[in-house]
Curated annotation (Swiss-Prot):
Function comment: This plasmid-coded bactericidal protein is an endonuclease active on both single- and double-stranded DNA but with undefined specificity.
Amino acid composition bias (Basic and acidic residues), ranges on this chain: 297-321, 430-453, 465-476
Gene source species: Escherichia coli
UniProt keyword terms in alphabetical order: Antibiotic, Antimicrobial, Bacteriocin, Endonuclease, Hydrolase, Metal-binding, Nuclease, Plasmid, Zinc
Keyword set includes Amino-acid biosynthesis: no
Official protein name in the record: Colicin-E9
GO biological process, one term: defense response to bacterium
Length: 582
């Protein structure tokens, strides 16, 4: 594992333009119109007769084809759109297909659902380190959504009340305000080769503020979010949109908060849209995400995995802590599952015992009735005998008792099946908990070992003889060894942390004329301050530009933190390849 780059240029925080793993709730919104949906020709500001959908060209009537403003050669204030307006309820990702003039959406500005409000409230309470985090609302099935023509690729549109997510009311912003800080965003991310729509938080974020412009259609506005198709928007303040899933959009029932990925938001454009004051509409937050094809999802997942691996390599302590937190959360969930199944099993046993007692009593009643029949059986063929009536009564009792036994047997069989199922479920839950306990223990052990980097220690080891071009080997094999002359200077010295040790290594390099001979003036200045020198550009990867210290035997596997014979100097490119097993 790496000791890092010595510059602090990799803080461990993910980019705010990256992915999220997660968890979720959220239901997509159907783009269709139907009675009772809150979207029909009677309340549709886009026009289009009953049963006709929405038509933006051809036909008769002012502004709908050859009329003023809305034909292809009009002023453009009405738009030339062939798309059906997608009803969008706050917090519910909706599928929308662009037409010639952009995306048409009808935002239902009713109250935010309790489920979505709960997710936002939950995110505000979370304090995960090193990364943005979020909850998955929905997952996408690209094969059911993606089209061959890139210009007709469907989009996922999600809206939220702007004042619920901004740090200050939008109405208080200056008219020339270009951006606004937000507490959460709705972005796309990838996990397990599935594209998700997630609510993310945890890092400073801001989005553009754009003004909606009125069109010639009453109640219809246009807005341009940078990088997204033009939006043609109507706002419905009274009737809520239908909160049902669009084809290809699946509800994610897992509401867990998880770290967001490095590529979260990679195919999302969002903004706060401010309406004219005289419209009476409050500002809304709108997020527009591309629906990726299966190949695009795979490519992005590969990039996500690559960037995660790079980050883990230079942040082993943080990576171990993240894995431990995940393992601990999984164990907590496993404990809850065991407790729930124990409760189910206890109830099943109680019902089983009760049904068994009832069945035993019914069988006894039947046995008594049969015995009574036998007692009067000698009168069965003598209708005139006084005992014949008693024999008949005993037979009726036996019939009723048999019916009761049958019913009690059915109830007992059902209880026995539930008990068997509950026993099996409890056993499976306990086995899963055992696995999670082992995983949590392994993660804790690894964290404890990796945390040695942050603990004091004494430098050991002899290093190896090197020449003035020793850093040329940093991009080869296992990297360049710690020079023996540096090891002689540092051996037996105490260091507060591995960062202090790293700084001392480069300071000693700066004092050695031969080892620093081939460093350029800028790098000589860096090492004199204890900073790692820059590598050649072809050995740099992303933000990782300086030489790094790598433990040949990982600390998590028992490698010693301050053993200079276990430490190599590597370039970022070579360091990444080492951790990839190359």
């Amino acid at each position: 594992m790496s000791g890092g780059d010595g510059r602090g240029h990799n803080t461990g925080a993910h980019s705010t333009s990256g992915n999220i793993n997660g968890g979720p709730t959220g239901i997509g919104v159907s783009g269709g119109a139907s009675d009772g949906s809150g979207w029909s020709s009677e309340n549709n500001p886009w026009g289009g007769g009953s049963g006709s959908g929405i038509h933006w060209g051809g036909g008769s009537g002012r502004g709908n084809g050859g009329g003023n403003g809305n034909s292809g050669g009009g002023s453009g204030t009405g738009g030339n759109l062939s798309a059906v307006a997608a009803p969008v309820a706050f917090g519910f990702p909706a599928l929308s297909t662009p037409g010639a003039g952009g995306l048409a959406v009808s935002i239902s500005a009713s109250e935010l659902s309790a489920a979505i409000a709960g997710i936002i409230a939950k995110l505000k309470k979370v304090n995960l380190k090193f990364t943005p985090f979020g909850v998955v609302l929905s997952s996408l099935i690209p094969s059911e959504i993606a089209k061959d023509d890139p210009n007709m690729m469907s989009k996922i549109v999600t809206s939220l009340p702007a004042d619920d997510i901004t740090e200050s009311p939008v109405s208080s912003l200056p008219l020339d305000k270009a951006t606004v800080n937000v507490n959460v965003r709705v972005v796309d991310d990838v996990k397990d080769e599935r594209q998700n729509i997630s609510v993310v938080s945890g890092v400073p974020m801001s989005v553009p503020v754009v003004d909606a412009k009125p069109t010639e259609r009453p109640g219809v506005f246009t807005a341009s979010i940078p990088g997204a198709p033009v939006l043609n928007i109507s706002v419905n303040d009274s009737t809520p949109a239908v909160q049902t899933l669009s084809p290809g959009v699946t509800n994610n029932t897992d509401k867990d908060v998880r770290p967001a990925g490095f590529t979260q938001g990679g195919n999302t454009r969002d903004a706060v849209i401010r309406f004219p004051k005289d419209s009476g509409h409050n500002a809304v937050y709108v997020s527009v995400s591309d629906v990726l094809s299966p190949d695009q999802v795979k490519q992005r997942q590969d990039e996500e995995n690559r960037r995660q691996q790079e980050w883990d390599a230079t942040h082993p302590v943080e990576a171990a802590e993240r894995n431990y937190e995940r393992a601990r959360a999984e164990l907590n969930q496993a404990n809850e599952d065991v407790a729930r199944n124990q409760e189910r099993q206890a109830k099943a046993v109680q019902v089983y015992n009760s049904r068994k007692s009832e069945l035993d009593a019914a069988n006894k009643t039947l046995a008594d009735a049969i015995a009574e029949i036998k007692q009067f059986n000698r009168f069965a063929h003598d209708p005139m005998a006084g005992g014949h009536r008693m024999w008949q009564m005993a037979g009726l009792k036996a019939q009723r008792a048999q019916t009761d036994v049958n019913n009690k047997q059915a109830a007992f069989d059902a209880a026995a099946k539930e008990k068997s199922d509950a026993d099996a479920a409890l056993s499976a839950a306990q086995e899963r908990r055992k696995q999670k306990e082992n995983k949590e223990k392994d993660a804790k052990d690894k964290l404890d070992k990796e945390s040695k980097r942050n603990k004091p220690g004494k430098a050991t080891g002899k290093g190896k003889p090197v020449g003035d071009k020793w850093l040329d080997d940093a991009g080869k094999d296992s990297g360049a060894p710690i020079p023996d002359r540096i090891a002689d200077k540092l051996r037996d010295k105490e260091f507060k942390s591995f960062d202090d040790f790293r700084k001392a290594v480069w300071e000693e390099v700066s004092k050695d004329p031969e080892l620093s001979k081939n460093l350029n003036p800028s790098n000589k200045s860096s090492v004199s301050k204890g900073y790692s020198p820059f590598t050649p550009k072809n050995q740099q990867v992303g933000g990782r530009k300086v030489y790094e210290l790598h433990h040949d035997k990982p600390i998590s596997q028992g490698g010693e933190v301050y053993d200079m014979d276990n430490i190599r100097v590597t370039t970022p490119k070579r360091h990444i390849d080492i951790h990839r097993g190359k």
